[in-house]
Amino acid sequence: MNLEEARTRMIAQQLRTWDVFDNQVLEAVRQSARELFVPKDYYDFAFADMEIPLAYNQYMMTPKVEGRLLQSLALKADEKILEVGTGSGFLTACLSHLSKTTVSIDIIPQFTTDTRQKLNHLNIKNVELHTKDVFDLNNNDQFAVIAITGSLPSIDERLIQMLRPSGRMFVIVGQAPVMEALLITKNTNEDWMQETLFETVVAPLSNTNHHEPFVL
């Protein structure tokens, strides 16, 4: 497989055809070496339009959904980002190219350990990796952007409270086979609005049933 040709086809045939045109996003995807983040058994499918299985019943998002996630958040180079669900680490790498600091958390130690090794290999230094539940974070921590990589049954208000004013959050909500990707924008400490981006289905975020959510 010619990696650069496959990467270029993925961007042209999957991301661009799904309205991902932001050049900074496309360049972040290009630089992040997706082939390094897929399981060995799926190396030949690294650039395919499919959800690649990971351990613990988790999956990589398709490239086009990853692209839309990145573009919808309108990331800025001076922002601090929270990624909920490290997973394969590919999206973590993409976020690192578009932010000042990316804090990525996962409850599965294998995911954060493997991602740390891969990011070190790529010489990515602006990522903090933690093995913990999102609701175990310091209550005083607030982020300009939150990217949630697995689906939730509904919006959890506690996640919105982690956003700074004017902060944005990407989240997929619902139950299979009906889910939708949302962009949440926080206006003030109490006020926020949501925009429906597209319909999709992705695996639930690990541990979503561990806490009773405060849902709206």
Residue ranges and their predicted role:
Residues 74-193:
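Conserved nucleotide-cofactor-binding alpha/beta core module
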